[in-house]
Amino acid sequence: MSFRTIDYSISGVLAVSLLLLSISFLFGAGPNTISDTFSFYGLTEWVPVATLGIVFGFALMVAAGLVILQQCKIVPAAWPLTLVAIISLFTLLTLFAENRWISAHGGFPVIGSGQGIIKYFALVPIALFLYCRHHINTRPLVWANYLPVALVLAWIGGMKFLELEAKAIVPLVETSPFMSWMYDLFSVQEASNIIGAYDLLMAGLLGIGIWFNQRILIGVASLGCLAVFVMTQSFLFTASGAFSDMSLLGGLGQFVIKDLWFIANIMVMASLTLESSPPESLESAVA
């Protein structure tokens, strides 16, 4: 697969996810998400939450448009890179808010609504690959895209060993044609433990493969990680709450659609580590 095809694929994944989120927020989705995010900056005291949702939705839509326009060489790379970085940083800083953590379980590192926020770590590495790889050596770029994948798999995977998370995923697992069988063989907690252990194992194997430059291990672990995020996309069609008649994506849909970003991260890593020869842009960067 050529890097031009990879660029188009990753840009498409990024643009589609941003567009779906933007439409949802423009139509009033996730008022609690908007309130929790903007209250960190004190903006909800001055501007109605509904208006802030429209502003955030508009920013996401502009970002999606810039991603597409840059692929058509209509706008410079700095435009989508800058806006994606701003959106990512704006949301990630709210992890310092107490309401991102479950206070009943001691707060940090027991993550609550922050599970959806840590996914924004994936955006900047994707943008760096699309718009800055001429200026970045291959290995740092691979690690930059690995870290968000490892973070979400390790953190959310680790949460699977807690009772509250095991119960929280029951509506997802029991309606999935690919995973519901687990409850026939294991208890709710045992099934959650297995899922969590799988997440941790795949994240660890991928990191080891990258560290030691073992292409076979990278390939196997990448497929293992990819399976996690492809599986979560299936929840859009099997679990309730993924879509809304009023705002396109419901709460679950907004959470799940962001996993497309990790699929893009994995595509970046695979393209940089599994190609038989580096692309010209990377060769020039190393030189």
Predicted regions and their residues:
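Membrane-interface extramembranous regions
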Residues: 1-287
